[in-house]
Design a protein with these regions (language model features):
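N-terminal targeting sequences that direct proteins away from the cytosol to non-cytosolic compartments
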Residues: 1-151, 159-165, 169-198
Length: 198
């Protein structure tokens, strides 16, 4: 559970679909052994379904995957959290940054907050409205070049409700994942629970 101004928010998620990486996870004695066991179980399930190699031709390294998530989580500002999707065989973990912020008196344009404005994308960002059940929000998909000329996709789901912006951000250079994972990202937005602080 996280405080944002006078709001309290949490994520209604859990294994095997999602993993939440808590701040200071390296200092939690039980966390890494538990996640290692969970990842080894998922890896074995992938092996049984698809053989020893992933679609990309490599074996998912459990220790490396955990270290990458921990490093990513530690790099985030205090008002952001990291979760990882585990539901796509051979492609997990897919890290997603969750940010919940109070709307200011002169709020930023939601399109800008979701990454639809600014920068130099290689084409105009795609903007879609979220399903009605998720509230007033958008999904923005944009493609940019990195310094080496590789194409990266950024998918952002943003919702503004009750004076709070909820923004989920996922980046990947595996472009074939974008149409498969975008609906999953939307479902995560529906799992963000926001209430008032006592």
């Amino acid at each position: 559970m996280t405080n944002t101004a006078e709001r309290v928010w949490s994520l209604d998620i859990g294994f095997p679909d999602w993993l939440s990486i808590p701040r200071g996870a390296r200092d939690i004695d039980w966390w890494r052994p538990a996640v290692t066991l969970a990842f080894e179980t998922l890896s074995e399930a992938d092996h049984q379904l698809r053989g020893p190699l992933s679609e990309s031709g490599t074996v998912i390294g459990v220790d490396e995957a955990i270290d990458t998530l921990l490093d990513f989580a530690e790099s985030l500002p205090a008002d952001q959290r990291l979760v990882a999707a585990l539901g796509l065989p051979d492609r997990w973990p897919l890290p997603v940054v969750v940010a919940v912020t109070a709307v200011e008196d002169e709020p930023q344009d939601l399109l800008a907050a979701a990454g639809a404005r600014g920068g130099r994308p290689i084409e105009l960002p795609l903007v879609d409205y979220l399903p009605d059940e998720l509230g007033d929000g958008i999904r923005v998909t944009r493609f940019d070049l990195d310094d080496e000329g590789a194409v990266w996709a950024t998918v952002c789901c943003a919702r503004r409700a009750d004076d709070v912006d909820t923004i989920l951000t996922w980046r990947t250079n595996k472009l074939d994942l974008v149409p498969r994972f975008s609906p999953v990202l939307e479902s995560l937005l529906g799992a963000v629970r926001i209430g008032s602080a006592a």
